[in-house]
Amino acid sequence: MIQSQTHLNVADNSGARELMCIRIIGTSNRRYAHIGDVIVAVIKEAAPNSPLERSEVIRAVIVRTCKELKRDNGMIIRYDDNAAVVIDQEGNPKGTRIFGAIARELRQLNFTKIVSLAPEVL
């Protein structure tokens, strides 16, 4: 579960390395965000010579959480870290590569570009 002030790893090559969640998009008073939710985040750590800079406010979609994800067939998926992919206003990823596995639920939420770039979809 991701809430305000949660630090996340970045799962793409956009130039950001660590994010901090500021807000969850789509509702006024929701406390937690899960896989597939869009958040507003600030960059806490960035790679040198990257187009994204530290303290820049961006949008990101959550692709991995430490909290379990229960599917309808009874399968439970849990990842080792909290990770997000930086996106633009249209929902397209800013990076050209995705690192690590992502959940199949992103395809149902119309993040097909992220799913196609991912090396493994669970």
Swiss-Prot record:
A cellular component annotation (GO) from this entry: large ribosomal subunit
Family affiliation: Belongs to the universal ribosomal protein uL14 family.
Principal cellular location given in the protein's record: plastid
Superkingdom, taxonomy of origin: Eukaryota
GO biological process per UniProt: translation
Assembly and oligomerization: Part of the 50S ribosomal subunit.
Coiled-coil spans in chain: none
Protein known as: Large ribosomal subunit protein uL14c
Subcellular location(s) of the protein: Plastid, Chloroplast
Function: Binds to 23S rRNA.
UniProt entry tagged with the keyword RNA-binding: yes
UniProt keyword annotations, A-Z: Chloroplast, Plastid, Ribonucleoprotein, Ribosomal protein, RNA-binding, rRNA-binding
Listed SMART domains: Ribosomal_L14
CDD domains noted in UniProt: Ribosomal_uL14
Keyword RNA-binding: yes
GO MF terms, alphabetically ordered: rRNA binding; structural constituent of ribosome
